[in-house]
């Protein structure tokens, strides 16, 4: 590698604002704050909700008399 053309690669902490989990990694950016991480995101924790749209479809059809 050529010297003095690459950015400084240093240890950094990625901290989640939602749950407070801190991940340690190496990056050229520095410390990073994120809103949500895999430890608290509903998709990864298995607490995701299924949105039921059948009521919306029926309301639309009734509104425009499509039945």
Curated annotation (Swiss-Prot):
Under Gene Ontology molecular function, one entry of this record is: rRNA binding
**What's an example Gene Ontology biological process for this entry?**
translation
Q: Which Pfam families match?
A: Ribosomal_L31
Q: Which GO terms describe its cellular component?
A: ribonucleoprotein complex; ribosome
Question: Sorted alphabetically, which keywords does the UniProt record give?
Answer: Ribonucleoprotein, Ribosomal protein, RNA-binding, rRNA-binding
InterPro entries referenced in this protein's UniProt entry, alphabetically: Ribosomal_bL28/bL31-like_sf, Ribosomal_bL31, Ribosomal_bL31_A, Ribosomal_bL31_sf
Family membership noted in the UniProt record: Belongs to the bacterial ribosomal protein bL31 family. Type A subfamily.
Subunit structure of this chain's protein = Part of the 50S ribosomal subunit.
Biological role: Binds the 23S rRNA.
Q: Which HAMAP family match?
A: Ribosomal_bL31_1
Protein name, per record:
Large ribosomal subunit protein bL31
Organismal lineage: Bacteria, Pseudomonadati, Spirochaetota, Spirochaetia, Leptospirales
